[in-house]
Amino acid sequence: MATYLIGDVHGCYDELIALLHKVEFTPGKDTLWLTGDLVARGPGSLDVLRYVKSLGDSVRLVLGNHDLHLLAVFAGISRNKPKDRLTPLLEAPDADELLNWLRRQPLLQIDEEKKLVMAHAGITPQWDLQTAKECARDVEAVLSSDSYPFFLDAMYGDMPNNWSPELRGLGRLRFITNAFTRMRFCFPNGQLDMYSKESPEEAPAPLKPWFAIPGPVAEEYSIAFGHWASLEGKGTPEGIYALDTGCCWGGSLTCLRWEDKQYFVQPSNRHKDLGEGEAVAS
């Protein structure tokens, strides 16, 4: 029985299956953890959702910002952008079933025995684990309710960007969503910066990666996250695992086997399509 953690799939179905074959993943015996952003940019978002849903109790995933955006597109709130390559999924006969399943997935996964926490973007240093649990439940409850389109319509935006237990209503839900699915940099006090997307070496002062600011969760738990492809899986402190290595941009899909901390990598098929000198986005 092994636990495999895989970074952002982004519709790269062929690479996902190849990677799972490489590690000899066995549903029913092994468990697969996915850092979110299952969909968008890659060519196989429909196949990814169908496969992951079919795994049942053998998979533990968290929602990412692209997964939430897909739900907003399906609800008619946001525009379907051609670059996201979501049309086959949106027009599939089982789209309703898949997306109703997707919106009932969590923002946070915790394994107390392994002392392991997973969220798409990470855990803000302003939260302890109990607060993170409560905040995740707040958004999950709305997403799984009949009023979820109202939330999806209001989730876009960068404010508020500083946590307070006094936050209420849509502002509270928006902060929680941004912290779990969009966060990269913070100010020294933990306040979110929602604008900078570069590598940590290029970030303007006084911004720091969220994981470089001491927080109560990281003191007791390992944290696995995705979202930040330009990290290339590097530069995090011990116990912090950055797993998004930019498969949909021509990088790779990365898997961490938890029991022995061994990494496995599947190169992106997209590098074959990138022209010479073409930039690889992050």
Swiss-Prot record:
**Assigned keywords, A-Z:** Hydrolase
Q: What is its EC number?
A: 3.6.1.41
Q: Name one Pfam family in it.
A: Metallophos
Lineage top rank: taxon: Bacteria
Q: Which InterPro entries match?
A: ApaH, Calcineurin-like_PHP_ApaH, Metallo-depent_PP-like
- Which Gene3D superfamilies did the record assign? 3.60.21.10
Enumerate the GO terms in the molecular function aspect.
bis(5'-nucleosyl)-tetraphosphatase (symmetrical) activity
Segments passing through the bilayer? none
Q: Which reaction does it catalyse?
A: P(1),P(4)-bis(5'-adenosyl) tetraphosphate + H2O = 2 ADP + 2 H(+)
Which family is this protein grouped under?
Belongs to the Ap4A hydrolase family.
User: What the protein does?
Assistant: Hydrolyzes diadenosine 5',5'''-P1,P4-tetraphosphate to yield ADP.
Assembly mode: Monomer.
Name of this chain's protein = Bis(5'-nucleosyl)-tetraphosphatase, symmetrical
Source organism per UniProt: Escherichia coli O157:H7
Q: Could you read off the lineage of the organism from its UniProt record?
A: Bacteria, Pseudomonadati, Pseudomonadota, Gammaproteobacteria, Enterobacterales
Q: Which gene encodes it?
A: apaH
